[in-house]
From Swiss-Prot:
Keywords: Cytoplasm, Protein biosynthesis. Belongs to the RRF family. This is Ribosome-recycling factor. Its main location: cytoplasm. The gene is frr. GO terms for molecular function: ribosomal large subunit binding. InterPro entries: Ribosome_recyc_fac, Ribosome_recyc_fac_dom, RRF_sf. The keyword Protein biosynthesis applies.
Length: 188
């Protein structure tokens, strides 16, 4: 393989890794039956005159499988933290215990599990679309090089095969990540 092909594949790999990371971030926001600090990541608290991420006003811990605790550093914002979690749309009902906000994670209903699985499926499909978009860019670059006679038709075939192989690997990664998340969501 030529250095130019290696450079192109390295660039495409970097961009496809970005699509995978984006998918993982999106899926981490979906609530499964287990407690996870990532669950509270999107929560923003009205504190100190502006909205700040929950992680900037306290530390999040998982003392039990179905319980999160937020140890708030400044007692003046404990009420705001509790309110922000309650109003977050995550279906959580926190309670305050001194400077600690306890957040029990309720069991998911079958209907809610199915909704979350559909949302995970949409995220996975968006991940595949991103990977395919990167592949399309790589194919266009390859065709442009062939058109300018910088690579031969044989080289173009080698390059497109390498790009397709890389794409297939990343599509499989997306499918595997989705399958794991779906299994986690469906687990009672």
């Amino acid at each position: 393989m030529s250095a130019a092909l290696n450079d192109l594949l390295a660039d495409l790999t970097r961009r496809m890794d970005g699509a995978i990371e984006s998918l993982r971030r999106d899926l981490s926001g979906l609530r499964s039956g287990r407690a996870s600090p990532n669950l509270l990541e999107p929560v923003r608290v009205e504190a100190y005159g502006s909205e700040v991420p929950l992680s900037q006003v306290g530390s999040i811990a998982v003392p039990e499988a179905r319980m999160l605790t937020v140890s708030v550093w400044d007692r003046t914002v404990v009420g705001a933290v509790e309110r922000a979690i309650r109003d977050s749309g995550l279906g959580l009902n926190p309670s305050t215990d001194g400077q600690t906000v306890r957040v029990p994670i309720p069991a998911l209903t079958e209907e809610r599990r199915n909704e979350l699985a559909r949302a995970a499926s949409r995220y996975a499909e968006n991940g595949k679309i991103s990977v395919r978009g990167v592949r399309r860019d790589g194919m266009e670059q390859t065709k442009a090089l062939e058109k300018k006679s910088e690579i031969s038709q044989d080289d173009m075939k080698t390059w497109t095969d390498a790009i397709q192989k890389l794409t297939d690997q990343y599509i499989k990664k997306v499918d595997d990540i989705f399958a794991d998340k779906e299994r986690e969501i469906k687990q009672v």
